[in-house]
Amino acid sequence: PKEWMLKSMKDGKYPDIHLQKGNVVIGSMAEGCTYLLKERGVSRLHAKIMEKADGIYLLDLNSTNGTFLNGEMIEPGRDYKIEEGDMVAFANCEFVIVTSLLN
């Protein structure tokens, strides 16, 4: 099995976001978020990453400054499938999707 994660594009500026089974909510408010990203432009509840039977999906939670997939702003409330190597940005916090094999 593979472990999916989002790795910071700025050399470890932000901790890795590990996508364990289930949902990961990214935002700037401790309550309700799985991953806290206290940066300017990041909404309290910014985006959600979900694991489904056919892959990993990204969902913008009506954030103020948007969620971007490979440089394009995604539409809030719609699921976007993400793949290894994709670039994801929450406001201007940029990450790349990587996988590693679990032993």
What positions do the PLM features span?
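Intrinsically disordered, low-complexity acidic Ser/Thr-rich regulatory segments
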Residues: 1-40, 52, 87, 96, ...
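Structured beta-strand/turn binding interfaces of compact recognition modules in eukaryotic regulators
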Residues: 9, 29, 61, 72, ...
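Residue-level marker for the onset of beta-strands and adjacent loop->beta junctions
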Residues: 13, 33, 45, 76-78, ...
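C-terminal boundary/linker segments immediately following FHA domains
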Residues: 26, 68-103
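Short hydrophobic/aromatic patches on the structural cores and recognition surfaces of FHA
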Residues: 26, 45-50, 54-59, 63-69, ...
